[in-house]
Regions:
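ABC ATPase "signature
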Residues: 127-128
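Conserved signature/switch motifs of ABC ATPase nucleotide-binding domains
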Residues: 42, 63, 95
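H-loop/switch region of ABC-family ATPase nucleotide-binding domains
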Residues: 103-104
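Catalytic Walker B motif of ABC-type/P-loop ATPase nucleotide-binding domains
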Residues: 68-71
Length: 153
């Protein structure tokens, strides 16, 4: 049950062997970048699901990765919290961060992606630029999925 700040500092000091002062400076910078600097001393029980997810993003960014993998980052969130996490991810994309995102948030995928891969049964069914895949999918299964999605949206 570490604070948000310690959650971002510890991986840097343990894995990267960064000096604690530098790790803290980097952690605070990234907590600020995801709108969580005011919660640096908060513990998990004091944070909403969306806030916890943003701390997790700050922790990952504190390690200064080349790529970040997001596996359904909004699936366990209340609907009200989804937007705040997607907004942080959108800013990351705009900053040039390479992200691999597994998501059912189709509007987000269409708006933010350079490349989209549609998987069906664990196999790549179709891939392409968002305009191609969402605008004129080639595979029947992709068309079926997207038509269902568009009806629900």
């Amino acid at each position: 049950n570490m604070t948000a700040l310690e959650n971002c500092v510890r991986p840097q000091t343990v894995v990267l062997k960064r000096p604690r002062a530098e790790a803290k400076r980097i952690a605070l910078e990234h907590l600020d970048s995801v709108g969580m600097s005011a919660f640096a001393n908060a513990r998990p029980s004091q944070l909403s699901g969306g806030q916890k997810q943003r701390v997790a993003i700050a922790r990952a960014l504190s390690m200064r990765p080349d790529v970040i993998l997001f596996d359904e980052p909004t699936s366990a969130l209340d609907p009200e919290m989804v937007g705040e996490v997607l907004e942080v991810m959108k800013k990351l994309a705009q900053s040039g961060m390479t992200m691999v995102v597994v998501t059912h948030e189709m509007a987000f995928a269409r708006d933010v992606s350079d490349r989209v891969i549609f998987m069906d049964g664990g196999v790549i069914a179709e891939e392409g630029a968002p305009e191609e895949l969402f605008g004129s999918p080639k595979q029947p299964r992709t068309r079926e999925f997207l038509s269902r999605y568009l009806r629900q949206a």
